[in-house]
Amino acid sequence: MRQGRSATPTLLIVDAQSVKNADTAGFKGYDAGKKVSGIKRHIAVDTQGLPHAIAVTTAEVTDRKGALLALQRCKPALCKVQALLCDSGYVGKPFAQGVKDILGEHVSVQIAKRSELHTFKVMPQRWVVERSFAWLEKNRRLWKNCERLLNTSLQFIHLAFLALLLKRF
């Protein structure tokens, strides 16, 4: 690619974002942890912040299940991935085993932990996925979920990242 990197990443950074529903939204779920009624966007990005796996679910779906769904949907394009960097919402052997079942036994799951719970601290490499979510928020249509179908919301996320890529390159 233009930046001198391989098109297939070896490290993916995984995270989920809860988004509130508008009145017109068709699917509704409740994320009890963040107290949001709406949907969740699950993305896995490379070190440049470019998405390689995306899934949209109702908000009650756990981060772990949503990430596995995103990885399963994009499995053929993720053949060279060696490691996943996740936050503490992805802790657990079932998630790590699910990643190994989807991507292969060679893939390791690394959990980035905060040293102190009640202080804000930027975690190394985790900010990349947060920046990708911020890029999505620049699109007015993605501020809230107003789509009747989850697939429509997913396609608008793809369009937003495509527009970003076209501007960037």
Regions found by a protein language model. Name each.
Residues 60, 79-153:
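Helix-centered, glycine/charged polyanion-binding patches within enzymatic domains
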Residues 31-34:
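Short Gly/Pro-enriched turn/cap motifs at secondary-structure boundaries
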Residues 38-42:
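Short glycine-rich loop/turn motifs
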Residues 55-76:
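Active-site beta-loop-alpha junctions of metal-dependent nucleic acid enzymes
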Residues 156-169:
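Charged phosphate-binding loop/patch that engages nucleotide di/tri-phosphates or the phosphate backbone
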Residues 15, 43, 49, 67, ...:
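Mobile genetic element proteins and their domesticated derivatives, centered on retroelements
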Residues 1-28, 45-46:
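Active-site- or DNA-interface-adjacent structural scaffold in DNA-acting proteins
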